[in-house]
C-alpha cells in the first residue's frame, strides 16, 4: 500500500515538474517516470534546467536592451523634431514682427542689422542656387551640343560618302559609254568598220 502511494506521488511530482518545464522552458526534455526511476538523472536534469534558465535570462536581457535602445532613439527623434518645430515657429514669429516694423517704419537698429544680415544670407543662398542651376543648365547644353554635333558629323560623313559613290558610279558609266578606238572614232575597240574585211585589215597592217 505504501509502495503504491509512493509510486503515485512520484507520478504526480513528475507531472508537476513537466508542467512547469513546459510553461517556463518550452523544448526542455520532459522527465519520464518508469518504475520509480527517471530516464534522466537528477544531476543532469538540474544542469539542463539551470543552463536553459540562464539562456532565457540572457535572451530576456538582450530583448530589454533592444527595446530600451529603440525607445531612446524614438525619444531623441521626437525631441529633435520638437526643437526644430519650436525654432521654426519662433523664426516665423520674428520675421512677422520684422515685416510689420518695416512696413510701419519702426525698425530698431538691432532689428535693422538682423534684417540686413538675413537679406544678405538669403541673397547668397539664391546666388548659390542660381549658380548651381546655371552650371547645370550649361552642362546640359554642352552635352546636347556635343551629341548634336556628333550625330550631324556622322550624317554629313555618310552623305559625303553616298555622293562620292554616286559620282564615281556615273563617271564609270560615262567612261564605259564613250571609250573610242584610236583608229576608228565612234567604234568600240575590237570592231572593224563596215566593209573592211579581216584580209584588208591584215594587209594594212603589213
UniProtKB/Swiss-Prot annotation:
Biased composition, class Acidic residues, residue ranges: 197-206
Chain positions covered by the region annotation Disordered: 178-206
Modified residues (Phosphoserine): 197, 202-203
Keyword list, A-Z: Nucleus, Phosphoprotein, Transcription, Transcription regulation
Entry's localization field: Nucleus, Nucleolus
The UniProt record lists the keyword Nucleus: yes
Purpose: Involved in ribosome biogenesis, probably through modulation of rDNA transcription.
Listed name of the protein: Regulator of rDNA transcription 14
Protein species of origin: Saccharomyces cerevisiae (strain JAY291)
Gene: RRT14
Amino acid at each position: 500500500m505504501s509502495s503504491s502511494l509512493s509510486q503515485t506521488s512520484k507520478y504526480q511530482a513528475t507531472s508537476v515538474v513537466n508542467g512547469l518545464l513546459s510553461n517556463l522552458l518550452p523544448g526542455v526534455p520532459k522527465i519520464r517516470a518508469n518504475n520509480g526511476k527517471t530516464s534522466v538523472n537528477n544531476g543532469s536534469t538540474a544542469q539542463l534546467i539551470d543552463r536553459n534558465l540562464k539562456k532565457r535570462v540572457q535572451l530576456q536581457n538582450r530583448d530589454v536592451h533592444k527595446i530600451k535602445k529603440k525607445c531612446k532613439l524614438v525619444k531623441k527623434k521626437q525631441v529633435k523634431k520638437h526643437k526644430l518645430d519650436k525654432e521654426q515657429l519662433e523664426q516665423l514669429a520674428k520675421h512677422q514682427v520684422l515685416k510689420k516694423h518695416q512696413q510701419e517704419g519702426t525698425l530698431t537698429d538691432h532689428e535693422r542689422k538682423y534684417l540686413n544680415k538675413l537679406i544678405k544670407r538669403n541673397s547668397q543662398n539664391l546666388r548659390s542656387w542660381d549658380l548651381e542651376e546655371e552650371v547645370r543648365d550649361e552642362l546640359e547644353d554642352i552635352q546636347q551640343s556635343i551629341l548634336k554635333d556628333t550625330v550631324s558629323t556622322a550624317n554629313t560623313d555618310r552623305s559625303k560618302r553616298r555622293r562620292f559613290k554616286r559620282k564615281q558610279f556615273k563617271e564609270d558609266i560615262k567612261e564605259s559609254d564613250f571609250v573610242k578606238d584610236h583608229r576608228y572614232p565612234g567604234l568600240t575597240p575590237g570592231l572593224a568598220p563596215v566593209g573592211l574585211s579581216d584580209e584588208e585589215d591584215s594587209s594594212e597592217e603589213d
